[in-house]
Amino acid sequence: AKQQETASVTSFLEGVWSGVRRSESKDFEESPQTGVSIKKFIDLSKRSTDLHKPGSPGEKLKFFAKIEKLYENRRKMVTENKSLDWAMAENMAYATLLSQNCNVRLSGQDSGRGTFSQRHAIITAEDNTKYVPLNHISEDQATFEVYNSFLSEYGVLGFEYGYAYASPNSLTIWEAQFGDFANGAQIVIDQFVASSETKWQRMNGVVLMLPHGHEGQGPEHTSARIERFLTLCADNNKQIINCTTPANF
């Protein structure tokens, strides 16, 4: 150690991070264009709600009637009604990213079905086959992964943070289950999500989806209210986004 008078720190913006630059103030002042053409949007809406057997366009998988109706209604939201609910807007956000070769990973305690039975990203056919429609929109698409995690916010968010660090070109999401319980992961949020770039010059693109706020559900069910996270904002370290319409997805 005495023979080495200086130490060099290698930039982390190498390897898989080589195409990423540091954020600037202007990045937080304007939104980039993220839309797709109406034609592509309609096409993806049909593909992402198609329940036919993979590799056999003429053979349709048999699902519970309510699931088939749900996916039929989702398709009609785009092709007929021209009005999307929250679940379909989220579905289309993922579909467009997948079509642009951006992998999407979603995990949480009830992420496959969705806490309010709204997502149904993983559906089960009558022969017990698991089917993820978003993985069948095209042959050259990116991968959609959705996992129902175990009951440990601290451990799961820590894992997803590490996954996002290794895969900066993917969208990695940790979803708090109903009631939030985000405070169970507070150490990861404080020490890594909010401050790793300042402390260790390490950026990370993990997204925390916290669908609830202060709704009178009790002390353990209101931990994701927005002011808790606003207090951790400094030097453009993160964005706090309050979605008020399905279009915000």
What are these regions (language model features)?
Residues A1-F249:
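Flexible, glycine-rich loop/tail regions that form catalytic "lids" or insertion modules at the edges
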